[in-house]
Regions:
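Conserved helicase NTPase motor core
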Residues: 7-10, 15-16, 21-25, 33-35, ...
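Walker A (P-loop) phosphate-binding loop of P-loop NTPases
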Residues: 29
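ATP-hydrolysis module of ASCE/P-loop NTPase motor domains
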Residues: 53, 94-101, 119-191, 303, ...
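Conserved P-loop NTPase-based nucleic-acid remodeling module centered on helicase motor cores
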Residues: 53-159, 213-217, 445-449
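Conserved ATP-driven helicase/translocase motor core recognized via long
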Residues: 55, 174-362
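Core structural elements
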Residues: 100-111, 162-188, 341-347, 362-375
């Protein structure tokens, strides 16, 4: 049982810290679930300010995890009651534990909608559609949409389909629409996000282009590839040193490794391009009669080096061959296609939402967005919590989020809208290395952004 555990000083601090929001990075096997359970128990058993368990919101990302957490908490409370049978507060917690808000984010959103459907004029008889039903509905909506577009035959649509759906097969275009739709609905305001996609391709200068989100992402990914390649060189150099007598190889590899590492440290695209294009590869050293190293070992090292060389040359040709003018031209050409894709995706989003509402269906993404509409209002100054959110804020003394690395931007806004700002009460725990919900567009970088503050 958690009460019998010996806590480390760090775990004890996590369990006991109060009156502030807290983000805990906990690796697998570090006992984070036990720590979370103990924090819950200490909150409800606090001698100075005991909290009823139904005033805590504990959110995790799987039904199994929520069930396990509930069982652990109930067992821990039962043990405290056994030790203190006359404690009326503990006996009350034992009763309340059956109604404790230990839940998945989807279940919490569902409860918000069941209680406040009238706030967004939602039919209370809605039901959650199954995956097969949704796929059929998506296919019907897309088929009708594309049929209308073909009939209207606008120039932008025809050019888009010629590029991405040659012949009579629309499948690639359909998949692009669905993929972009998936990214859009993983954001709090999907239509705003789609509009921003178009704006991202309107740069008139390299300075502006380098600030676009897609360009920043690409630059970071290229830097990562270069860093990994530099690390490969370090391994090659280590092999040379272990073998001995390979100073000529080591000299060539060290020179190349330094150039690649220098390139990986560039912070902007134009610096990255300049440094990558300055990388020069040396010739293979000839083995002298006096050299004692193994030919097999030398071949293994040089084969690895050739792979790294191909990687760098491929990056140079694919990403760094164009000057500023050509890059801006390509961006504008891509922007034309992106604009059409966004238009089609936006049309699909509206039609698909209307089709679901007509059938009184919601999917899991709808649960989150509809709950968000109940809890947060978009204003010219940004998102503003609603009166309903204020009620939840008063209801919950603390909001505990397990597996925080699996949150996306919609879930983040939902939970922050019901958290307190005057008395911060968010407790978040997770491990960015264990993000398992990328397929649902979880954003583990949310964890890193908070962790680095």
């Amino acid at each position: 049982m958690a009460d019998n555990m010996t806590w480390t000083s760090e775990q004890k601090q996590v369990i006991d810290l109060r009156d502030r929001s807290l983000l805990v990075s906990a690796a697998a096997g570090s006992g984070k679930t036990a720590v979370l359970v103990q924090r819950i128990i200490e909150r409800i058993c606090d001698e100075s300010h005991p909290v009823d368990i139904d005033r805590l919101l504990v959110v995790t990302f799987t039904n199994a995890a929520a069930g396990e957490m509930r069982e652990r908490v109930q067992a821990a409370i039962a043990k405290r009651v056994e030790e203190n049978p006359d404690n009326t507060h503990l006996r009350r917690q034992e009763v309340l534990a059956g109604h404790a808000h230990i839940t998945t984010i989807d279940s919490f959103c569902l409860s918000v909608l069941r209680e406040h459907f009238q706030e967004i004029e939602l039919d209370p008889g809605f039901r959650i559609a199954d995956e097969g039903e949704l796929k059929l509905l998506q296919a019907d909506v897309l088929e009708a949409l594309l049929e209308e577009e073909y009939e209207q035959a606008s120039e932008s649509f025809i050019h888009f389909m010629e590029a991405y759906a040659p012949g009579k097969d629309d499948e690639r275009a359909v998949q692009l629409i669905l993929q972009l739709y998936g990214f859009a609905v993983a954001n709090p305001r999907p239509e705003d996000w789609l509009n921003h996609c178009i704006e991202s391709y309107g740069a008139e200068s390299m300075e502006t282009l380098e600030k676009q989100p897609w360009m920043c992402t690409m630059t970071e990914q290229l830097r990562t590839i270069l860093s990994e390649t530099a690390a490969l060189y370090k391994r090659m150099i280590a092999v040379c040193r272990d073998e001995g007598g390979m100073e000529s190889y080591e000299s060539v590899l060290l020179s190349e490794q330094q150039m690649i590492e220098y390139a990986s440290e560039a912070s902007k695209y134009d610096e990255l391009r300049e440094r990558v294009n300055l990388i020069r590869f040396g010739s293979k050293p000839r083995k002298k009669k006096t050299d004692s190293f193994s030919e097999d070992k030398a071949k293994r090292v040089w084969d690895m080096r050739e792979q790294a060389k191909k990687q760098i040359k491929s990056l140079s040709e694919d990403y760094f061959a164009d000057d500023d003018e050509r890059l801006l031209q390509k961006q504008h050409l891509a922007g034309v296609q992106v604009k059409e894709l966004v238009r089609l995706t936006h049309a699909f989003l509206l039609r698909y939402s209307a089709a679901k509402r007509k059938k009184n269906l919601v999917d899991f993404g709808d649960l989150e967005h509809l709950a968000l509409n109940v809890l947060s209002e978009k204003t010219p100054d940004g998102e503003k919590p609603t009166l309903v959110a204020a009620q939840y804020r008063e209801s919950f003394e603390e909001i505990m989020i397990d597996e925080y690395q699996d949150s996306n931007y919609v879930q983040e806004l939902i939970l922050t809208s019901i958290s307190r700002t005057d008395q911060p009460n968010l407790f978040m725990v997770g491990d960015v290395k264990q993000s398992i919900y990328r397929f649902r567009l979880a954003r583990p970088e949310l964890f890193m952004e908070k962790y680095e503050i």
